[in-house]
Amino acid sequence: MNKLAGHANSFHSYSAHEALAGIAEAGYRYVELSAVPGWTEHVDVHGDTAVTRVQLERYGLQAVSISGHSDLRTRAGLEHGLAVVRWAERFGVPIVNTAIGGHAHVEESEDPFMAYIGTLADAAQAAGLVVALEIHGDLMASGEIAIPLLDRIGHPAVKVNYDTANVEHYSGARAEDDLPLIADRVANVHLKDSRGGKGEWDFPAIGEGHVDFGRVLAILSEAGYEGPYAVEIEFSGEPWPPLDEVTEAMRASRAALAAHGLS
């Protein structure tokens, strides 16, 4: 049975406590944690996992994945990725989500990334984890675009974190058209709505944009997807809305997905 989580990144400018409290208040039982340098740094992957355990227990939440995006074209990015994998192994989180160029949208080049991804994938495999590369940036702008890169990587521990809004933001393709091409490689899904087109940052609550979530869920069900879903809302970027508005958007998103049979 798929688990529906709230993504802590939806509370980007707020503390870990505020994010977890808001996710729980909005009715979620699961969470995707965030340890993204320079963006949403709720988890200290060099610190004691007990800190996060106590926080999750306080709000009655279980972690299903962690976002640890870093620039995997660089040694520093690899080192952060390895630190996230080690933390996830200690904590017991099975999926580490990341992106080739980290959070920032940079011009990506394949060869530097290929020099490091094998090391990260081997570490994840040894730890019994999966590295899920997000639909994000240039080299993985869509599922269709990502397939040759995934084939070149050719590692069983490397899967896809499919973002239903990023695919349109970076490639112009619609999730319901692109997802069937890559559904069998998906290990994690960011359920994110969009009101904009290519290059437009406008990611509202689920149901307020034009992503066809009924179709998205049907495609993944038909593909036998059993992994987690994480609701991610990034609004119109910074500055983030007031905390109560973020929590309400997460609650409304959960209700919208319940109408499609996901709760």
Language-model-detected regions and their locations in the chain:
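Structural motif corresponding to the early beta-alpha repeats
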Residues: 28-29, 33-116, 125-130, 221, ...
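Histidine-acidic metal/acid-base catalytic patches
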Residues: 1-29, 53, 57-60, 92, ...
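Conserved anion-binding
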Residues: 134, 138
